[in-house]
Amino acid sequence: MIQNKEALDQVREEAVKVLDSYDCRILVCSGTGCVATGSQKIYEKFMEIAKDAPGVTIEFGPHDKDAHIGVKKTGCQGVCELGPLVRIQKGDDVIQYTKVQIEDCQEIFEKSVQGNETIERLLYQKGGKVSRGPKDIPFIAKQTRIVLKNCGKFDAESLEEYIASGGFQALEKAMFEMDPDLVIDQVDKSGIRGRGGGGFPAGKKWIQVAPQADPVHYVVCNGDEGDPGAFMDGSVMEGDPYRLIEGMMLAAYAVRAQHGYIYVRAEYPQSVARLKHAIAVLEEVGLLGDDILGTGFSFHMHINRGAGAFVCGEGSALTAYIEGSRGIPRVKPPRTVEQGLWAKPTVLNNVETYANIPEIILKGADWYRSIGTEGSPGTKTFSLTGSIENTGLIEVPMGTTLREIIFDIGGGLKSGAAFKAVQIGGPSGGCLTEEHLDVPLDFDSVKKYGAIVGSGGLVVMDENTCMVEVARFFMGFTQRESCGKCGPCRIGTKRMLEILEKIVAGKGEMEDLDKLEHLGNFIKDRSLCGLGKSAPLPVLSTLKNFRDEYVEHIVDKKCAAHVCKAMRSYVIDPEKCKGCTKCARNCPVGAITGNKKEPHSIDTSKCIKCGTCLENCVFGAISVN
């Protein structure tokens, strides 16, 4: 049991010694992306090899003092596209291996764990340059990690490793050197703004909750993260769960709350498992529960698993769901800080916001403000996806430009394709163009151009992307996820989706563009909650920045990107066709005819424009008009 400050300091001292005593640590990425590509089997294989290796003492239990080799499951190591990822650490020397397979494990163990060789074929390679360690990889080296600083470096489930890395130092400092009001003052002075999308200053929320007369206060964490392609919060919850919990404990200490709730979306089973494990361990050692560290401060944590509704990311809908009611937004005021969970004053922040708090308390508000911009201090995590060379999880200072993220960190577009747009902020965000590449990525700057930082999804699109279809896709998502409580969102998004579907089907009219703009602005102004207010942004931003594509779809009945099925027509070039019959044999509706070894043709009246012929032609004889 860790019952007082002295006991915590002793555990930290011992944990640091154990961590430093390893001859080698095999760090297997167990982020969701790597688990999907087989990292669990790789972890098991390394355990099997190490167990049978002569003269090797492997760690089987936590805090094993006799072990000199540790096989660890870490959080996300970042370069998700190149998984499964494995790091071999000997002291300060770290080798980063990529795309590791089961058959590579024995070789890695013999050459890099027991020996000092590096296996070059498994290293990160780009443009003829080979990168040996994580710090040599531009994707990682050009980041500034605060929230993600432990991810990929330590065992995500080990309390000892978290404490050894500086964990709970901030809580210890707050409880023994600062009163609750001073903690709030530091958070407020740091200028940290909510990382869930709204960008409201976190300290202002805490200031409003703390002095309220009601003796019951709550802290709640929004771990919903429903944006398609976003996985930042999930990576923190599964890769560094103790950091999130420490951040919530600091909030609870500051606003005098005794209970905290983490709402986790249903699609994050590994996050739920890691958080449950962390809470159980902390309760067992006395760092959660009653009279923590003998200070009289008591705090209990609970996990609520969502049912997958996107709207539950909205504060009042989230608290309603935790209470057992249907997750739908309510009219405000009163706001969550006044009447939140069970109508009690509630601090509600997202995962990334809480994960920043320990560093702010430990290093001070001035240190935090030295990073980022004046109006948006600190760093921001982003999930970088789409038509880009390096996809994965990144963390950069606020104010970093899109150009730096896409071309310096992301490595540019795949196959040398031309950049067209970047969709930022998920279904609630907007699409920015090449002329916006040098815009600082912070809460205020991107807003001027019809986008939002949001939770941090970045989808890079190349010249083969149809922006009208992008707008239709996101409007379809938000329309399906609308709770239906208010008319502007329930009916308005449906009408906008119908117009967009009409345009991509080749039946649009020029007056439809005015209708989309009118509806979009009406929904943005009149909807009840943030989901409805931001739902039209992808449409409005593409109308502003890519209006010519809408006109092309309507007037010319043409999709230059060849994405909209209704506007495609497939043609066989008789000069290239060899009459192999493969296209005819695979056509699901028999629209292709021709004799063997003679040029074939497509009956456009029968063609359903599925593209099967294009996929099957090995001679490049079929093209799309």
Predicted regions and their residues:
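Short amphipathic, charge-patterned alpha-helical segments
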Residues: G247-M249, G399-K414
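Ferredoxin-type iron-sulfur electron-transfer modules in oxidoreductases and energy-metabolism complexes
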Residues: I2-C24, Q40-V71, L82, V86-Y124, ...
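C-terminal accessory/binding modules appended to enzymatic or scaffolding proteins
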Residues: S376-N390, V396-M398, L402, V563-I608, ...
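Iron-sulfur cluster-binding cysteine motifs and their immediate structural context
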Residues: P84-I88, P488-K494, K582-S601, T612-N625
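Hydrophobic alpha-helical positions that pack around
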Residues: K142-Q143, V272-M398, G410
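Conserved phosphate/anionic-ligand binding catalytic regions in large, soluble enzymes, centered on
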Residues: S30-G38, E81, G167, V187-V209, ...
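Flexible inter-domain linker/hinge segments
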Residues: L123-V187, A343, N349-G364
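Gly-rich Lys/Arg/Thr-decorated short loops/hinges at beta-loop-alpha junctions or inter-strand turns
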Residues: K153-Q169, C221-D233, T336-L341, S383-I388, ...
